[in-house]
Design a protein with these regions (language model features):
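Catalytic core of carbohydrate-active enzymes
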Residues: 1-173, 177-196
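Short acidic/polar inter-strand loop motif in beta-rich domains
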Residues: 204-209
Length: 210
């Protein structure tokens, strides 16, 4: 969702967000907006307001600083995700104990690649992608409210190592970095794999999916 600045001096911009969805500022994962709301943003003529719909996957080929995600991601596809639950819930009661599961499945697909995620139950996030002929994948989860307990590479059966900084993650070319201040989790899955990717993130929560 794009709300360009087209008039000088451009000190403010009134944005009406479409109802039925929530939105996150593309440039800042800490800024979120409810669907159906009208918000006046303080902006300058050089700003470019862009918003990601909650629940969506945006694949990015980062090749310049204009994307706001740094040149360190160049050569990889960045799957930028704002996870949500669907409204479909399966609930059941057994011997007085009520349980509920909520499953969310979102998919992005192009000719050479398919990405999807699921949120089958609280604190468990699953991401899968088919192989890309030349590019590895970096998963970027937005609006997180708790860092994960662990990140598992399901294809190779090993735990992905937490890194101390985004720079460390990129320099090693593998691992994950959780930035609670920015409400973002990065998972670097290395170079292009002939088997695709499959990871499970445990113990995480986000603004729109607990």
């Amino acid at each position: 969702f794009v709300a360009p600045i087209v008039e000088a001096p451009g000190l403010s911009k009134t944005v009406v967000f479409p109802s039925g969805n929530n939105f996150v500022d593309y440039w800042d994962s800490t800024k979120t907006y409810e669907g159906g709301s009208t918000v006046t943003l303080n902006v300058s003529i050089t700003d470019f307001p862009v918003f990601q719909r909650a629940g969506s996957i945006i694949p990015l080929e980062v090749s310049s600083r204009l994307t706001g995600h740094g040149l360190a991601s160049d050569g990889h596809l960045t799957a930028m995700i704002v996870p949500t639950h669907t409204s479909t819930q399966d609930s059941q009661s057994t011997q007085g104990v009520h349980t509920a599961t909520t499953t969310s499945v979102r998919r992005w697909k192009e000719e050479s690649m398919d990405m999807s995620y699921k949120w089958p139950r609280g604190g468990l996030f699953q991401f899968q992608s088919t192989p890309h002929p030349t590019r590895g994948v970096i998963v970027l989860l937005r609006t997180i409210t708790a860092c994960p307990h662990s990140v598992i590479d399901e294809l190779y059966g090993n735990e992905i190592t937490a890194q101390a900084s985004l720079e460390d993650m990129h320099s090693k070319g593998y691992g994950y970095f959780c930035d609670l201040r920015a409400k973002q989790l990065f998972v670097h899955l290395g170079h292009s794999s002939p088997h695709g990717n499959s990871i499970t993130i445990k113990g995480i929560s986000t603004l729109y999916a607990l």
